[in-house]
C-alpha cells in the first residue's frame, strides 16, 4: 500500500532494492520499513526482473517503472492488430493481465481520453440507411425466386428446382435445374421472362456475390441491369414470401417420383394456381388473368371409365386440394386450441370479490366513546398499527368523518374516518369505580346544595334515568357489540340501585339520630 503523497515508482524501486539486497533503500523512511516488508512478500525476482505475484502468488505480472515502458505497454494494449482502439475497461484488463505499476488505472484513463483517434470516433455518428419497402401494387411487378434441392437425379439429369412466385397474385412457376450455378439459374429466369415478361424486381435469399453474378448473366442475356436484389435488405415484408405449402408438397412429390419428378413440375404449378388461397378467396389464376380457366370438374375427362387409371394431373390436383384442406384444418384447430386455452385460463382465474367499504360498521354516533386506529407506526423494525384512546365523538362531518375529543376534552386536529374507529368497552373494575365515584360526588353535592331532596332518592332517580336511556338506546342501536355493552351496563346498574336504596335508609337513620341529639341538647 503506497502512502498518500508518495511516488509510486519510488515505492517499487524500494521494494526491488529490498528483494535484491535484503536491505532498505537509502530513501526509505523508518516509518515505511514495515510497509516495505509486507509489500515485498507479493513480489519475486525472475531472470533479474521483478514480477508481481499477489497474495495468492498465482499472478505473474511484470513490474513497469519507467515512463517509456508504460507508454509502450499502453499503446500495445489500447490498439489491436486490426487498427481498432479498445475502451477503458478492455484496455485496463489487457494491461493488468500482464503488467503492474501503482497508478495503472489512472494512466489507462488518461491515455484513452487523450487518444485522438478515439475522440474522433466517439463524435462520429453513423446513420443507418432507411429501409424502403417495395409496394406490391400490380401483378408480376415483384417476384421471389427460391431454389430447392438437391432431389433424386431424374431421367433428364435434373437435380434442383427453381420456384418463382408473384407476390401480388401468388402465381407460381416451377422449372427444373441441372445445377444451381449462376448461368443455369439465369437461363431459367430468362425462359420465364419470355413467357410473362420481366418484373420490376426479383428478390432472392442468397449471398450477395451469387446475386451479383446472376445480375451480370441477366444483363448479358437480356440486357437488364440490377434486377435481382437480396432478401436480407428488408425491401419486402416477411409475410410476403413463397407459401410453405408449395415447398412441402414439392419435396414430397419429388420423393414419391424420384425418376420423373421434373416432368410434373408444370402440372404442380398449374394445380397450385387454380386452387383457392387465403385471404382473398380468389385463385392466383384469376388474380393474374382476371378470369378462371375452364376446368371440366363435372365431366369424367380427367378420369377414365374404369376409375383406376386416373390422369397424373388429376392426382396432383386432388393431392394439392387435400394438402390445402389439411393446412386449413391445422390452422383452424390451432385457432380453436388457442381460444380454448384462453377460455381455460380465464376460467382458472380466481375472481376475488372485494368487500364493500363499511363507512360506519359499528353505527357510531355523537357522544360514543371510541378507540382510534393509529397506522404506520414504526416499532421493532417494522410498521405497526395500534388502537389508542379512549376518545369521544364530538360531531360527524358531511363526508362521514368523526371529529374527536380526547379524555381531557381537547379536540383533535384532524377528522378520523369512521372505519378507523371502534367502540371503547370498559372493563368491569373501571365501570364500578366510575359509578362509585360518581355516586359519592353526587351525594356530597346534593347534601350541601339540595337538602330538601333525599340523597338516596336523587341518586336512584339518576341511575334509573340512565337505565331508561340505555333501554332507549338499545332500541336505536343495531350492532351486536352495542347490545352486549348495554346489557352489561344494565346488569351493573341494578345492584347499584339496590345498594343506593340501602344507603338511603342508613342516611335517614343517621339524620333522625342527629335530630334527637339536638333536641336533647336544646
UniProtKB/Swiss-Prot annotation:
Residues 135-292 form the Integrase catalytic domain. Coiled coil: none annotated. GO terms for biological process: DNA integration. InterPro entries: Integrase_cat-core, Integrase_H2C2, Retrovirus_Pol_polyprotein, RNaseH-like_sf, RNaseH_sf. PROSITE patterns: INTEGRASE (PS50994). It holds the Pfam family Integrase_H2C2. Transmembrane segments: none annotated. One of its GO terms (molecular function) is nucleic acid binding. This is Gypsy retrotransposon integrase-like protein 1.
Amino acid at each position: 500500500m503506497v502512502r498518500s503523497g508518495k511516488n509510486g515508482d519510488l515505492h517499487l524501486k524500494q521494494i526491488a532494492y529490498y528483494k535484491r539486497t535484503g536491505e532498505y533503500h537509502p530513501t526509505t523512511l523508518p516509518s515505511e520499513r514495515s510497509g516495505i516488508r509486507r509489500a515485498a512478500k507479493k513480489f519475486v525476482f525472475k531472470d533479474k526482473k521483478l514480477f508481481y505475484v499477489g497474495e495468492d502468488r498465482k499472478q505473474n505480472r511484470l513490474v513497469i517503472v519507467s515512463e517509456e515502458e508504460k507508454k509502450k505497454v499502453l499503446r500495445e494494449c489500447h490498439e489491436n492488430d486490426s487498427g481498432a482502439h479498445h475502451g477503458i475497461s478492455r484496455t485496463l484488463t489487457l494491461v493488468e493481465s500482464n503488467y503492474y505499476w501503482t497508478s495503472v488505472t489512472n494512466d489507462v484513463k488518461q491515455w484513452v481520453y487523450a487518444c485522438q483517434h478515439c475522440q474522433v470516433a466517439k463524435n462520429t455518428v453513423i446513420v443507418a440507411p432507411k429501409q424502403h419497402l417495395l409496394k406490391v401494387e400490380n401483378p408480376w411487378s415483384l417476384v421471389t425466386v427460391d431454389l430447392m434441392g438437391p432431389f433424386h437425379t431424374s431421367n433428364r439429369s435434373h437435380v434442383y428446382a427453381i420456384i418463382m412466385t408473384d407476390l401480388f397474385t401468388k402465381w407460381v412457376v416451377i422449372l427444373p435445374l441441372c445445377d444451381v450455378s449462376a448461368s443455369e439459374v439465369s437461363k431459367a429466369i430468362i425462359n420465364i421472362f419470355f413467357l410473362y415478361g420481366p418484373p420490376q424486381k426479383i428478390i432472392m435469399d442468397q449471398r450477395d456475390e451469387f446475386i451479383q453474378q446472376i445480375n451480370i448473366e441477366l444483363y448479358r442475356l437480356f440486357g437488364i441491369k440490377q434486377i435481382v436484389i437480396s432478401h436480407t435488405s428488408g425491401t419486402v415484408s416477411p409475410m410476403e414470401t413463397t407459401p410453405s405449402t408449395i415447398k412441402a408438397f414439392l419435396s414430397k412429390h419429388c420423393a414419391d417420383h424420384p425418376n420423373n419428378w421434373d416432368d410434373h413440375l408444370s402440372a404442380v404449378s398449374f394445380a397450385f394456381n387454380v386452387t383457392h388461397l387465403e385471404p382473398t378467396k380468389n385463385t392466383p389464376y384469376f388474380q393474374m388473368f382476371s378470369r378462371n380457366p375452364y376446368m371440366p370438374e363435372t365431366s369424367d375427362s380427367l378420369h377414365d371409365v374404369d376409375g383406376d387409371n386416373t390422369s397424373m394431373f388429376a392426382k396432383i390436383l386432388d393431392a394439392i386440394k387435400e394438402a390445402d384442406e389439411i393446412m386449413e384444418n391445422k390452422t383452424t384447430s390451432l385457432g380453436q386450441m388457442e381460444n380454448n386455452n384462453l377460455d381455460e385460463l380465464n376460467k382458472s382465474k380466481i375472481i376475488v370479490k372485494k368487500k364493500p367499504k363499511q363507512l360506519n360498521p359499528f353505527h357510531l354516533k355523537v357522544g360514543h366513546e371510541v378507540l382510534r386506529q393509529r397506522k404506520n407506526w414504526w416499532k421493532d423494525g417494522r410498521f405497526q398499527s395500534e388502537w389508542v384512546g379512549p376518545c369521544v365523538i364530538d360531531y360527524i362531518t358531511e363526508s362521514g368523518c368523526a371529529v374527536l375529543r380526547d379524555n381531557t376534552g381537547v379536540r383533535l386536529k384532524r377528522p378520523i374516518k369512521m372505519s378507523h374507529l371502534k367502540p371503547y368497552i370498559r372493563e368491569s373494575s373501571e365501570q364500578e369505580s366510575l359509578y362509585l365515584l360518581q355516586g359519592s360526588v353526587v351525594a356530597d353535592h346534593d347534601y350541601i346544595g339540595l337538602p330538601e331532596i333525599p340523597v338516596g332518592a336523587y341518586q336512584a332517580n339518576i341511575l334509573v334515568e340512565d337505565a331508561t336511556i340505555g333501554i332507549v338506546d338499545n332500541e336505536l342501536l343495531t350492532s351486536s357489540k352495542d347490545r352486549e355493552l348495554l346489557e352489561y351496563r344494565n346488569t351493573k346498574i341494578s345492584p347499584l340501585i339496590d345498594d343506593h336504596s340501602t344507603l338511603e335508609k342508613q342516611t335517614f337513620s343517621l339524620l333522625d339520630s342527629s335530630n334527637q341529639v339536638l333536641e336533647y341538647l336544646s
